């Protein structure tokens, strides 16, 4: 098994709630709030794929995408300029397929031995599909919440058990995942020391610090 496969398996596990996860044959990933995806990644960039090459480095091979980095949101200390993104060539091993010279993507991934690896269990989305709040989150809010814990709720009852948790209930909605909290909210530590959901178009300040919506 290639290094890419070993790396991705660590972040990709089977989930019995198949209708709220992202299936791709043998690859099934647990839902992840965009803030968690941001905070748990070594690299977060906005980039356009400009080329690809199948690397013969294992039984299934690895796809190497050449990217033009537009902006980096996380990973300056790891790799300030990303040129290549690696992923499993097989979708059954959580490999992701990206269009060449077509879209700009938000890409998250991990760095291993000087290379950036990503896959279906990482957050990868076409840039134009991100909400305004998600784009703001990348620039300002998500980094403020990396010490908070987003606790998913799959069925009722569910509760927070510590002051650093935000209860994530998108999976209970009839609209499914990703839902309203994923698209519009960030879980941010407040000045009183607890974490709560924050929604707004400006960084938190004393006039909004006590918001607990939703």
Swiss-Prot record:
<feature type="disulfide bond">
    <location>
        <begin position="148"/>
        <end position="195"/>
    </location>
</feature>
<dbReference type="GO" id="GO:0008270">
    <property type="term" value="F:zinc ion binding"/>
</dbReference>
<keyword id="KW-0479">Metal-binding</keyword>
<dbReference type="InterPro" id="IPR027465">
    <property type="entry name" value="TIMP_C"/>
</dbReference>
<feature type="disulfide bond">
    <location>
        <begin position="39"/>
        <end position="146"/>
    </location>
</feature>
<feature type="disulfide bond">
    <location>
        <begin position="166"/>
        <end position="187"/>
    </location>
</feature>
<dbReference type="GO" id="GO:0034097">
    <property type="term" value="P:response to cytokine"/>
</dbReference>
<feature type="disulfide bond">
    <location>
        <begin position="27"/>
        <end position="94"/>
    </location>
</feature>
<keyword id="KW-0732">Signal</keyword>
<feature type="region of interest" description="Involved in metalloproteinase-binding">
    <location>
        <begin position="27"/>
        <end position="30"/>
    </location>
</feature>
<feature type="site" description="Involved in metalloproteinase-binding">
    <location>
        <position position="40"/>
    </location>
</feature>
<dbReference type="GO" id="GO:0005615">
    <property type="term" value="C:extracellular space"/>
</dbReference>
<dbReference type="GO" id="GO:0002020">
    <property type="term" value="F:protease binding"/>
</dbReference>
<keyword id="KW-0646">Protease inhibitor</keyword>
<feature type="disulfide bond">
    <location>
        <begin position="153"/>
        <end position="158"/>
    </location>
</feature>
<feature type="disulfide bond">
    <location>
        <begin position="29"/>
        <end position="121"/>
    </location>
</feature>
<dbReference type="GO" id="GO:0008191">
    <property type="term" value="F:metalloendopeptidase inhibitor activity"/>
</dbReference>
<dbReference type="InterPro" id="IPR001820">
    <property type="entry name" value="TIMP"/>
</dbReference>
<keyword id="KW-0483">Metalloprotease inhibitor</keyword>
<keyword id="KW-0272">Extracellular matrix</keyword>
<feature type="binding site">
    <location>
        <position position="27"/>
    </location>
    <ligand>
        <name>Zn(2+)</name>
    </ligand>
</feature>
<dbReference type="InterPro" id="IPR001134">
    <property type="entry name" value="Netrin_domain"/>
</dbReference>
<dbReference type="InterPro" id="IPR030490">
    <property type="entry name" value="TIMP_CS"/>
</dbReference>
<dbReference type="Pfam" id="PF00965">
    <property type="entry name" value="TIMP"/>
</dbReference>
<protein>
    <recommendedName>
        <fullName>Metalloproteinase inhibitor 3</fullName>
    </recommendedName>
</protein>
<dbReference type="GO" id="GO:0031012">
    <property type="term" value="C:extracellular matrix"/>
</dbReference>
<keyword id="KW-0481">Metalloenzyme inhibitor</keyword>
<keyword id="KW-1015">Disulfide bond</keyword>
<keyword id="KW-0862">Zinc</keyword>
<feature type="region of interest" description="Involved in metalloproteinase-binding">
    <location>
        <begin position="91"/>
        <end position="92"/>
    </location>
</feature>
<dbReference type="GO" id="GO:0009725">
    <property type="term" value="P:response to hormone"/>
</dbReference>
<comment type="function">
    <text>Complexes with metalloproteinases (such as collagenases) and irreversibly inactivates them by binding to their catalytic zinc cofactor. May form part of a tissue-specific acute response to remodeling stimuli.</text>
</comment>
<dbReference type="GO" id="GO:0051045">
    <property type="term" value="P:negative regulation of membrane protein ectodomain proteolysis"/>
</dbReference>
<feature type="signal peptide">
    <location>
        <begin position="1"/>
        <end position="26"/>
    </location>
</feature>
<dbReference type="InterPro" id="IPR008993">
    <property type="entry name" value="TIMP-like_OB-fold"/>
</dbReference>
<feature type="domain" description="NTR">
    <location>
        <begin position="27"/>
        <end position="146"/>
    </location>
</feature>
<keyword id="KW-0964">Secreted</keyword>
<comment type="similarity">
    <text>Belongs to the protease inhibitor I35 (TIMP) family.</text>
</comment>
């Amino acid at each position: 098994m290639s290094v890419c496969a070993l790396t991705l398996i660590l972040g990709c596990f089977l989930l019995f709630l198949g209708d709220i996860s992202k299936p791709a044959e043998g690859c099934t990933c647990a839902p992840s709030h965009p803030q968690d995806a941001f905070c748990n990644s070594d690299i977060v960039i906005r980039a356009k794929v400009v080329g690809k090459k199948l690397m013969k480095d294992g039984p299934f091979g690895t796809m190497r995408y050449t990217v033009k980095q537009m902006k980096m949101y996380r990973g300056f200390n790891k790799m300030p300029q990303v040129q290549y993104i690696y992923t499993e060539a097989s979708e059954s091993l959580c490999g992701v397929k990206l269009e060449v010279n077509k879209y700009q993507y938000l890409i998250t991934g991990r760095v291993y031995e000087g290379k950036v690896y990503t896959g279906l269990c990482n957050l990868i989305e076409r840039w134009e599909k991100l909400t305004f709040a998600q784009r703001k989150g990348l620039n300002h809010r998500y980094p403020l919440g990396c010490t908070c814990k987003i606790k998913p709720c799959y069925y009722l009852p569910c509760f927070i058990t510590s002051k650093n948790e935000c209860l994530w209930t998108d999976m209970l909605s009839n609209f499914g995942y990703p839902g309203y909290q994923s698209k519009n909210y960030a879980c941010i530590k407040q000045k009183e020391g607890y974490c709560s959901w924050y929604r707004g178009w400006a960084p938190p300040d004393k006039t909004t610090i006590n918001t607990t919506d939703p």
